[in-house]
């Protein structure tokens, strides 16, 4: 697929580069990561030259990142031509096969670079791995908290490098990851296992390893959700969380990972729809707060990269202003990109009118557009080769990625209770498996030589899978029914390890922090003694004596 890229020369004029999928010379090959520009002077000069060619409407468009429609570029052509968006975000309904996504990405970039100023798109996705994973193909890694239990930055790097390779192969150049939130609230309904840990230093270390690997792979990394979403008991998708903690506590708990990532040069920071009154703004959520975005993030932390809002279709940011006003206030607060506005036309028109009327100065608009252009230049978007469908399919089935996912899962399994040494089970044992993930756990145990029975009576042990049992009476009753059989009960917690606080009397308790198949296989390997548990608790468990760093081994 031939693709045109308009690039400025340093004198301020433009040249038209022609790259093909199979050309000679210096043109990149399909799927190849392009050379990223590292000289800040070159980036600044080229960004300024591009900006000078853009119309006001094109500048405003760069701030918009709508949701994609359908599974083809053609279905989004009108949005590109009318609004000149800075990017799009993929969701599962847009993603079918590697070949289809590669073709869609190529088509979107062709449309964008052939329209107006010819600025390539950020094509993003929420691919945190684990619970928040959009790709229906490729290796499925465990959640971030599994990495927190494994305590190995190299495993975090492997996860991010594999993810970046999978994304780049299908033309996705931005990942809304990693989560830099410090999960200190056991009742957090939206973060939980998406967080590495309750320990700020460990969160920062693992998030930094992921950021470096994403960006080394040519994929934009996004630290989220500033100023911190780890101490909420309200989901900002459905309401506005209020975190009433002091500035001192915030600096001690929530700030360190973000400061570390800012210092490390993270490409992008995502704001949170949370209200933190003691940080200096009791009226607006962080996404709409000039004090928190411009004052704290930019001026105090020294961040000059791209700031994106969290999705603007979430209730946490829509409770006090209409959707057009939300978009305007986010820009005034210091945001550069408006993610998923519920009405693209309304957001575009509101920001454009605010600039035309002088409420948003054109200088302020230019600041955001320059940040966006600089990042697109640094990550090589202007000379990116088209995604190659055949290569994309190969990357999606790459065995090295699946092996890495299993290594992460194996290293994360945390044994928190083992009464009378019930684990490991003998390979001759008969086991009944029920609850969350029973089919996959049972199959893995059978593969290891244990006999898996459909009958609860007569089993040598009962394995019960849970996920969120702390807040689910039905799961608690299921464990009680297993205990009533008289056989030893082994719980495999596949969400947060907080389930142990409501299951204090089980014989053995394993935390695997993920419902991914590799985590269920890892649990079976530990139950059968194939692997010795080496994970350590990355959080404290309320109502128990178990806390950060605890974990048993064989």
Question: Where are these predicted regions, by residue range?
Answer:
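Bacterial N-terminal signal peptides that target proteins for export
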Residues: 1-11
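A substrate-binding/cap region within the structured catalytic cores of diverse enzymes
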Residues: 145-172, 179-211, 398, 504, ...
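Short acidic, glycine-rich surface-loop motifs adjacent to enzyme active sites
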Residues: 79-98, 176, 186-187, 262-283, ...
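Preference for extracellular/luminal or secreted protein segments
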Residues: 4-5, 16, 22-83, 299-300, ...
């Amino acid at each position: 697929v031939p693709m045109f890229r308009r690039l400025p020369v340093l004198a301020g004029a433009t040249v038209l580069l022609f790259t093909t999928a199979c050309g000679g010379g210096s043109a990149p090959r399909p799927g190849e990561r392009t050379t990223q520009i590292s000289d800040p002077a070159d980036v600044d000069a080229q960004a300024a030259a591009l900006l000078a060619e853009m119309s006001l409407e094109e500048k405003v468009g760069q701030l918009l990142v709508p949701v994609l429609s359908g599974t083809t570029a053609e279905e989004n052509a009108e949005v590109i031509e009318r609004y000149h968006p800075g990017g799009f975000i993929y969701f599962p309904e847009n993603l079918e096969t590697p070949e289809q996504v590669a073709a869609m990405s190529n088509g979107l970039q062709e449309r964008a670079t052939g329209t107006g100023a010819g600025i390539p798109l950020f094509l993003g996705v929420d691919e945190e791995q684990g619970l928040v994973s959009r790709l229906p193909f490729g290796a499925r890694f465990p959640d971030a908290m599994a990495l927190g239990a494994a305590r190995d930055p190299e495993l975090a790097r492997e996860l991010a490098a594999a993810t970046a390779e999978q994304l780049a192969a299908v033309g996705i150049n931005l990942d809304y990851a990693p989560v830099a939130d410090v999960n200190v609230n056991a009742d957090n309904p939206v973060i939980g296992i998406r967080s590495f840990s309750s320990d700020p230093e460990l969160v920062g270390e693992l998030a930094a390893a992921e950021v470096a690997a994403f960006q080394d792979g040519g994929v934009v990394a996004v630290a989220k959700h500033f100023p911190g979403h780890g101490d909420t008991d309200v989901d900002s998708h459905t309401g506005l969380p209020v975190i009433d903690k002091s500035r001192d506590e915030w600096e001690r708990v929530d700030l360190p990972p973000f400061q570390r990532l800012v210092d490390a040069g993270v490409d992008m920071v995502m704001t949170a729809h949370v209200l933190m009154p003691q940080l200096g703004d009791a009226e607006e959520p962080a996404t709409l707060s000039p004090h928190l975005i411009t004052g704290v993030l930019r001026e105090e932390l020294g961040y000059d990269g791209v700031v994106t809002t969290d999705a603007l279709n979430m209730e946490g940011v829509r409770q006090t202003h209409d959707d057009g006003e939300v978009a305007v206030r986010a820009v005034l607060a210091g945001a550069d990109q408006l993610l998923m506005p519920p009405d693209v036309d309304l957001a575009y028109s509101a920001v454009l009118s605010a600039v035309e009327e002088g409420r948003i100065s054109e200088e302020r608009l230019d600041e955001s557009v320059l940040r966006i252009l600089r990042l697109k230049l640094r990550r090589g978007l202007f000379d990116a080769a088209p995604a190659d469908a055949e290569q994309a399919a190969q990357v999606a089935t790459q065995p090295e990625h699946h092996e890495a996912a299993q290594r992460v899962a194996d290293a994360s399994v945390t044994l928190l209770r083992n009464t009378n040494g019930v684990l490991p089970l003998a390979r001759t044992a008969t086991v009944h498996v029920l609850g969350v993930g029973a089919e996959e756990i049972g199959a893995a145990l059978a593969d290891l030589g244990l006999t898996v029975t459909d009958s609860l009576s007569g089993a040598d042990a009962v394995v019960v899978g849970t996920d969120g049992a702390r807040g689910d009476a039905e799961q608690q009753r299921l464990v009680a029914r297993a205990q009533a059989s008289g056989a030893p009960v082994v719980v495999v917690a596949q969400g947060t390890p907080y389930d142990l606080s409501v299951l204090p009397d089980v014989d053995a308790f394993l935390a695997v922090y993920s419902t991914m198949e590799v985590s269920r296989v890892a649990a079976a390997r530990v139950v059968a003694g194939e692997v010795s548990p080496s994970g350590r608790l990355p959080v404290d468990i309320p109502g128990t004596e178990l806390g950060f760093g605890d974990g048993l081994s064989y």
